[in-house]
């Protein structure tokens, strides 16, 4: 009797379920926008919350960041994995970071491998952020095989810190070896550098005997070699740099700055962008819209240099109601997101500094992000790094009234991720992004809503859209 009842229930459920069949239709291109947040590890600013936490505690904190990033509909996390000549990953070249479990102390797992796996599982990109030349910080211990102990001749004193001499070919080669080692061994989506090349004033006059022009030439050479090396190793890995927000005082006309990045930091970001030595530039436009360093004026200037490569501004959510800018409202960030979209020449994007302000909901920033990011978006493609477009998969779906189960079979292995879209007519949205190795998913009916079509679209490693499988009720 029990078996008969179970069989009846199964047949009843099957009868109620409706099929989604593949049809010979297309779907609009998914929305594109780079939506990233910096997760800083130096000084335990964002993660982990303090050094010495157990592996389980560190993982729990990182998963909370990734889960919240998905909830806010961000699509990339820029994780600092080399704060000062050390590593948040297993390395034969540099010691474990003191910001993890102590100087040179194995934390009991590989944080970068864990971050990559969990980010991809959630449809997020994971960009590895390197501080290229900072070596030691005053009063902070380092591991026994730290570069400052193995090759102290490569270091220069800069105030309370030491840096690898950026003009030294041996120092540059060490940094390149470190970064390319990560590119080869980890499935990262991007390599990211910040604004620290030569030190900021008043510590910029290190005793290297080089003129500002010679320093710039050295940094230019490093940036070019880095880009070439990454693209030769894995063309789909996105290379980005986030320089100081003003190239030089007076650019654009009338803009003032206490720091001359071109002279003091040997940072010629205009040249890197113009020559295509980066896949994107993220100038740190941390000022207000109505300040002397006007956000829109600076955004326009940077975007005009090379319209073929995107400029995505760094936006200072950390300055909401901060000591640096008392009274700055979260609405300022909201307005800057809007401006960055309207002024983008190539593609839109924003990078938020940093996770702490987002995670703590400074000034109610999360509600503003929810208003701007109403559906998921894919990071913009990089057709200059590869033009492969994945073929249409075969797919089918079942709807039992509560959930929709989708399954698909790819034609080849060129899909790095899948964008699941839902819509009718011209009204479509991306409801989730899945890793390339996944071939089925079960979604709540509410996520699809009244959409008459579902599209399962393959996305290549360089972000190119493939032909979707479209399903109809």
Placement of each model-derived feature along the sequence:
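Aromatic-lined carbohydrate-recognition surfaces of secreted/lumenal glycan-active proteins
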Residues: 125-137, 192-193, 215-262, 310-320
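Catalytic domains of carbohydrate-active enzymes, especially glycoside hydrolases
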Residues: 60-86, 185-190
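Active-site-adjacent "subsite" loops/lids of carbohydrate-active enzymes
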Residues: 32, 40-60, 117, 127-185, ...
């Amino acid at each position: 009797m029990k078996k008969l009842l179970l069989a009846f229930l199964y047949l009843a459920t099957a009868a109620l379920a409706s099929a989604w069949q593949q049809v010979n239709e297309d779907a609009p291109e998914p929305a594109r926008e780079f939506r990233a947040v910096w997760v800083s590890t130096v000084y335990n600013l964002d993660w982990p919350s303090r050094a010495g936490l157990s592996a389980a505690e560190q993982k729990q904190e990182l998963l909370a960041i990734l889960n919240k990033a998905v909830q806010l509909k961000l699509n990339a996390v820029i994780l600092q994995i080399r704060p000062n000549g050390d590593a948040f990953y297993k390395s034969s070249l540099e010691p474990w970071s003191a910001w993890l479990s102590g100087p040179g102390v194995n934390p009991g797992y590989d944080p970068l491998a864990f971050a990559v796996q969990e980010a991809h599982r959630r449809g997020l990109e994971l960009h590895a952020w390197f501080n290229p030349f900072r070596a030691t910080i005053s009063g902070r211990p380092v591991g026994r095989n730290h570069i400052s102990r193995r090759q102290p001749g490569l270091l220069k004193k800069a105030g309370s810190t030491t840096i690898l001499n950026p003009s030294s070919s041996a120092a540059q080669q060490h940094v390149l070896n470190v970064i390319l080692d990560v590119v080869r061994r980890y499935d990262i989506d991007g390599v990211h550098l910040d604004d620290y090349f030569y030190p900021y004033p008043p510590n910029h006059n290190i005793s290297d005997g080089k003129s500002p022009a010679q320093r710039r030439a050295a940094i230019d050479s490093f940036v070019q070699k880095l880009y070439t090396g990454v693209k030769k190793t894995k063309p789909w890995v996105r290379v980005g740099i986030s320089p100081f927000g003003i190239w030089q005082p007076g650019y654009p006309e009338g803009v003032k700055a206490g720091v001359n990045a071109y002279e003091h930091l040997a940072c010629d970001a205009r040249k890197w962008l113009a020559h295509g030595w980066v896949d994107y530039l993220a100038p740190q436009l941390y000022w207000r819209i109505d300040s002397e360093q006007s956000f829109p004026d600076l955004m326009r200037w940077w975007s005009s240099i090379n319209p073929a490569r995107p400029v995505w501004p760094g936006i200072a959510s950390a300055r909401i109601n901060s000591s640096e800018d008392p009274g700055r409202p979260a609405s300022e960030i909201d307005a800057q997101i809007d401006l960055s979209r309207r002024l983008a020449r190539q593609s839109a994007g924003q990078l938020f500094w940093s996770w702490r302000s987002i995670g703590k909901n400074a000034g109610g920033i999360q509600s503003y992000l929810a208003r701007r990011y109403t559906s998921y978006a894919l990071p913009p493609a990089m057709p200059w790094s590869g033009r492969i477009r994945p073929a249409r998969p075969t797919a089918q779906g079942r709807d039992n009234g509560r959930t929709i189960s989708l399954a698909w079979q790819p034609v080849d292995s060129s899909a790095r991720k899948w964008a699941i879209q839902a819509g009718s007519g011209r009204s479509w949205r991306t409801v989730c992004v899945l890793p390339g190795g996944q071939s089925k998913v079960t979604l709540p009916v509410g996520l699809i809503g009244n959409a008459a079509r579902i599209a399962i679209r393959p996305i290549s490693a360089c972000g190119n859209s493939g032909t979707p499988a479209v399903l109809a009720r």
